[in-house]
Amino acid sequence: VDGTGWGLVCDGMGGANGGRVASTLATQTMLRYFDHSLRTIENGEEKAFMMRAFDNANRAVYEKATSDPEVLGMGTTGVCALQRGNLAHIVHAGDSRAYLWHGGAIRQLTRDHSMVQQLVDSGQITREQAALHPQKNLITRALGVSANIVPEYNRCEVVPGDLLLLCTDGLTNMVPDAELALLLQESAFFDAPGVLVDRALKGGGQD
């Protein structure tokens, strides 16, 4: 679609096999939906379109998780960005994040759906304490864990030169936001994903 781009990141949970099945199934379901339907939507329909994509993926993962004992209880996070013109539309569930890099600075566009984020929101702990909290990986929303899902939507303006970063907690647990901004600024566009992954792995990341 002219002037349109989109991206998706899913991070599975429920054991090595279940997590892989959940994230793959969610990704494939949304890929088919975008390929089939993206060209048909009008301006202003982006939110509803993306919500349907998440609903379809949630249903696919949930039906598999409840019908196959080998992957019982599996689920996956999801964060999706759809850029059309000067607007980026973001939908997410879980703690995979979207960031906007603009003019050398980085801004988190999503709010983690996690127990620890709820503690931060209520003022019980600080963001610095959250980064070290032993339960920081307990999420409160994910694809496939219940029959219905209410993902979160937001949007922001973008201009030429901006970058949208979609990533899992495998990156954000290892690399602080300030360093993410610096790495994006210093890396060529097509080199950036590899640079970020290498940095996370060197920091002890497992994803």
Kindly label every feature range from the protein language model:
Residues 1-207:
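PP2C/PPM-type serine/threonine phosphatase catalytic domain
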